[in-house]
């Protein structure tokens, strides 16, 4: 794991006040007004089956852990932000075997910490971007989206990066809605955007 060192500043002096172990970390504005917290995922690969923990620390008089949750599988993506127009949360993406991913959506509670809302599972297909491009705002509406990849119906030697990307957004309940479909065909030199109404049943192949 890595170590995050936290210091206080008094005049021109730095004083170490805390050390936090982490595998993934994000410094987040908890209320949009400059109240910051430290969001940490810590993986434990020592066991036969990997596990991980999610922590939220707040600096009150000292650094305090205000939320903790254990999960099966290693955390590979930790992303905090808007998950709906008026809702903030965190996507915690974990895996036990790197062939299937589980995206946990946790909603921020007014009282502090998070509340588990849903889990979505999908097959992981490795691309050059690895895990860095799985959660992002793909359509510019300010809300985080989840990327899944759909393989062609036939066996293909195409690069996985040319597979159909289906981006999904939280449906406000316990699932994800399709919002955007894209094929980036670098081999033949075109991009193809698919209407979201097609994405629930679409099948395709390269010829």
PLM segments and residue spans:
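Proline-anchored loop/turn motifs at beta-strand termini and strand-loop-strand connectors
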Residues: 187-205
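Acidic/hydrophobic-patterned starts of short beta strands in beta-sheet-rich repeat architectures
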Residues: 1, 32-42, 84-95, 138-150
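Short loop/turn segments that connect beta-strands within beta-propeller blades
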Residues: 9-12, 59-62, 110-112
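Structural motif
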Residues: 2-5, 46-56, 98-110, 153-170
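Extended non-catalytic domains of envelope/secretory-pathway proteins
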Residues: 72-95, 114-115, 182-184, 188
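Repeated scaffold domains used in trafficking and secretory/extracellular systems
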Residues: 20-30, 72-82, 126-136
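A short beta-strand motif characteristic of beta-propeller blades
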Residues: 12-19, 64-70, 118-124
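Surface-exposed beta-loop interaction hotspot
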Residues: 28-32, 165-192
